[in-house]
């Protein structure tokens, strides 16, 4: 992401429905599958809200390839920070029990190498918690603006993760309730030749609260069951 996107992330991630719901789901999956006091690595940590919210569960390390992102992390009181690329993580082999990668894999040119690096730094039986955009047909100017390389089909993500040495515990679509609306908006935008810009903007307190309530209801479903389609994919896997 460019500097402007990190600035927007820092301003919005504690309030905007998308960031809050995604982060709460990721943290919940860590609580469900990772013992307390584990060493947790948040890769592609962005402005640091996820790492901050993971801190009560274990010893959290945060890594990003942007120094600007790490500056925002410091403002959130985070100190175990590393500047690094997901394809060449600056961590020892077998040094953490959990890796969290929320909407990161799509930013990496070589996703196979990134998953191998995640497997390398995890201890045996270590846990990966991951989210990533779903359905190539939803590709839009939003993806271009955020420097995505791809969106994933569930079968493709499963194959990639398993070939990297993981056993999949959970693999589900997410943002299920809003999928029809997002799909229509993306397809119409493509037909109209919409320009490349991130589709994240403040929508007002009322709509934001409503969307967050919907996503929290959906997150409760995801604790127990997989969903058949959605804008994103979420995964839990063990090395």
Language model features with spans:
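Conserved S-adenosyl-L-methionine
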Residues: 166-176
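A C-terminal cap/extension of S-adenosyl-L-methionine-dependent methyltransferases
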Residues: 178-239
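A short glycine-rich, Lys/Arg-flanked "PGG" loop and its adjoining helix->strand segment in the class I
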Residues: 112-127
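Residues lining the SAM
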Residues: 102-105, 131
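Short, glycine-/aromatic-enriched active-site segment of Class I SAM-dependent methyltransferases
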Residues: 10-13, 128-150, 154-162
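Conserved N-terminal segment of class I S-adenosyl-L-methionine
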Residues: 1-94, 98-102, 113-115, 221, ...
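A structural helix-start
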Residues: 51, 108-112, 132
């Amino acid at each position: 992401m460019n500097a402007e996107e990190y600035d927007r992330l820092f301003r919005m991630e504690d309030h905007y429905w998308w960031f809050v719901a995604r982060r709460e789901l990721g943290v919940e999956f860590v609580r469900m599958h990772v013992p307390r006091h584990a060493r947790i690595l948040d890769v592609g940590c962005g402005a640091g809200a996820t790492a901050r919210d993971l801190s009560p569960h274990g010893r959290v390390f945060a890594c990003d390839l942007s120094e600007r992102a790490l500056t925002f992390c410091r403002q959130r009181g985070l100190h175990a920070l590393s500047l690094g690329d997901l394809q060449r993580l600056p961590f020892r082999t077998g040094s953490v029990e959990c890796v969290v990668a929320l909407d990161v894999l799509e930013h990496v040119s070589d996703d196979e190498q990134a998953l191998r690096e995640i497997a390398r730094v995890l201890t045996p039986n270590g846990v990966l918690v991951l989210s990533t955009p779903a359905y190539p047909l939803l590709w839009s100017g939003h993806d271009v603006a955020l420097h995505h390389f791809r969106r994933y089909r569930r079968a493709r993500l499963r194959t990639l993760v398993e070939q990297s040495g993981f056993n999949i515990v959970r693999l589900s679509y997410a943002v299920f309730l809003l999928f029809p609306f997002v799909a229509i908006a993306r397809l119409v935008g493509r037909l109209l030749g919409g320009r490349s810009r991130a589709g994240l903007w403040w929508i007002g307190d009322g709509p934001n609260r409503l969307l967050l309530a919907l996503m929290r209801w959906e997150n409760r479903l995801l604790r127990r069951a997989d969903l058949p389609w959605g804008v994103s994919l979420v995964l839990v896997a063990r090395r």
